[in-house]
Amino acid sequence: VRLALFGPAPPFHGGIVTYLAMLHRTLAARGHELHWAGFRRQYPSLIFPGTSQTGETAGWMPAPDTARFTPWDPWSWRRTADDLRAFRPDAVIAKYWLPFFAPGFGSVLRRARGGGARWLYVLDNVVAHERYPLAGPLTRWALGRADGFVAMSDQVRADLLATVPGVDPARVADCPHPVYDFGVPGRPRKTRAQARAALGLPADARIALFFGFIKPYKGVTHLLGALPHLRERYGDAGFKLVVVGDVYGDRTPYDEARRTADCEPILDWREGYCPDEEVEDHVLAADLLVLPYVSATQSGIVQVAYAYDRPVVSTAVGGLPEVVRDGETGFLVPPEDPRALADAVIRFFDEGRAEAMGRAVAAERAKYSWDRLAETLERLAVGGGE
């Protein structure tokens, strides 16, 4: 089958790029002929809330075949659609996650479909985490003419059917986010001790990790609020919270939360974008990952943890309870509750849950394969559904 991917590609970085690169690798291994239509620009510098949109990506990631799309340039939309039509794909697979991209995506869809290709969306979320002007109409413009969808959680499916009237549920396939393995192909994994040594982390401390972009909806201030309870339980040497990620937007709430917590001896704050080839060390060095989200539809961070047999402590919001089995692969807690976060982390360590939960995660991981996603898209590409 001839398949085109449409979405950001190297040298852009971030979870969307990594997702599409791993999907590209899987589809290529399954024998499909591929074309990746990438982005020329992603966000205007004036409104980009992070520190860097481009940079080093993993060496195995393919470069895009074309890179013309700019979200605010209608001429680029036309050229992108023409590139896609010239490839003559059986289907175009696009990632959708933010209304900012909707005008361009909807326009490319309408022009590219003139060549007979089916248009498929893989949906991270339909309802944006942050408030966005005209989000509903923009999302309906982008998604309303698509031929099929992959919803990565029940929450995403429900949001799609509520937001875009007329979508036939039979055209919506359910497939959870696959696991993210950031290891370099052919390179052995480090041990926990080796990963900690490489990162300069204490060899014997209990280590919890928050990983990913630091945005308001991810609840990092509540996680910082849990630190006094963890310090009281384990002292200055027995526990470490490692926070790795780029702050999106105003950093003042995090600075204030750190001052209020007054727990710098047990906090390792590593601000900035983490290159893909450094992700593995951070996850291997940790005992568990923590997702203190205030809201969510799904999260690739759970799948990062699962790729390395690491349990999670997560808030019970959105689609997260669909992938975190409470008491088996991790613990679920209420959102916006620092004490509940602390109690779950303490329970994990004091009850010695790491080994049993790690085994449960390893068994659960089989559900979240890239081949499962590829098979789902293959069915949609030829007109099938769930």
Locate the predicted segments by residue:
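N-terminal strand-loop element at the rim of the active site
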Residues: 7-13, 17, 24-86, 100, ...
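Glycosyltransferase donor-sugar binding loop
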Residues: 39-43, 240-255, 272
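Donor nucleotide-sugar binding/catalytic pocket of nucleotide-sugar-dependent glycosyltransferases
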Residues: 144-187
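A short, well-ordered alpha-helix in the C-terminal region of glycosyltransferases
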Residues: 194-197, 353-367
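Conserved donor-binding/catalytic core segment of Leloir-type glycosyltransferases
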Residues: 202-218, 224-227, 241-242
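Nucleotide-activated donor-binding/catalytic signature segment of Leloir-type glycosyltransferases, i.e.
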Residues: 254-281
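Acidic donor-binding loop of glycosyltransferase active sites
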Residues: 281-297, 307-310
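Conserved acidic donor-binding segment of nucleotide-sugar-dependent glycosyltransferases
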Residues: 326-327, 331-338, 346-352
